[in-house]
Amino acid sequence: MQVQNNIASINAARNQGIETGKLKKSLEKLSSGFRIVRAGDDAAGLAISEGMRSRINSLNQAMRNIDDGIGLTNVGDGALTEVHSMLQRLKTLALKSANGTYDQSNRETLNMEKDQILEEIDRIGSTTKFGEISLFSRADANTNTQLWQPPELDDTIPLQIGGSAQAGEVLDVERYYIGSKELQLDQTNFSTVEKGQKSVEYIENAIEAVSKVRASFGAAYMHLDHTHNNLSVTSENMQAAESQIRDTNMAEEITKYTSSNIVLQSSNMMLTNANNLPQTILELLK
């Protein structure tokens, strides 16, 4: 029996320290919900997990961008729905003016309604916005006046619909500038039968032009909707994979915690007993 070095006590203290460390790690994992709390827990797993998290965050932001894009197409299509409705009314007026039964007073009334419709079309074209982005007009930065362009594709509104800057992850939504001039509706006149007949042609061309713009918005909407659904599934699957790598298996960790706790309590008891062993020497000396 040795007095200077209590080997049993030293061993018990060492084991107690080991189990205390294990218990702390288990508590960290159980309280945080993460299997990987620090890089030392699983360096490779942490690197993979962080890469996945970056991708997941990018996908989620891309879906928010797509939601904005869908909102933009809905705003544009909603405005053009009203333009279409007004063009249909305008065509009805033009067909009336092409009929020889209307006198000059009637034609003046038709022209007055036409002018009001054209003003409303111009108003929609100049004021329709998504946020601060004009969808159908462009304001000059120096003069704040409207610079109308032909009723054809002038430029695009880029939408980031992917999680990176790679090709194919940006959708360019076509933007058209629309107004009475672009649609050549300023050429319409109901003052005579001949002018009324010619006006019908202008209006039919305008209806076709607006239909093309709405079709463009519709195609963009479908593209965005399908992309959103695909990104949603991808994000969900990636989150599940990231969870498998990083999150705590609660059942397994509780088992480890319970085991370490039992061993720690045993170590405490053994350490107490080991520290009491030298007392037996005093008994021998009595």
Residue ranges and their predicted role:
Residues 33-51:
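Short amphipathic helix-turn modules centered on a small-residue break
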Residues 1-9, 38, 50, 63, ...:
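Amphipathic alpha-helical coiled-coil/heptad-repeat segments
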Residues 15-24, 50-64, 264, 268:
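Parallel, heptad-repeat alpha-helical coiled-coil signal-transduction segments
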Residues 1-5, 9-12, 27, 232-286:
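Proline-poor, low-complexity alpha-helical tail modules
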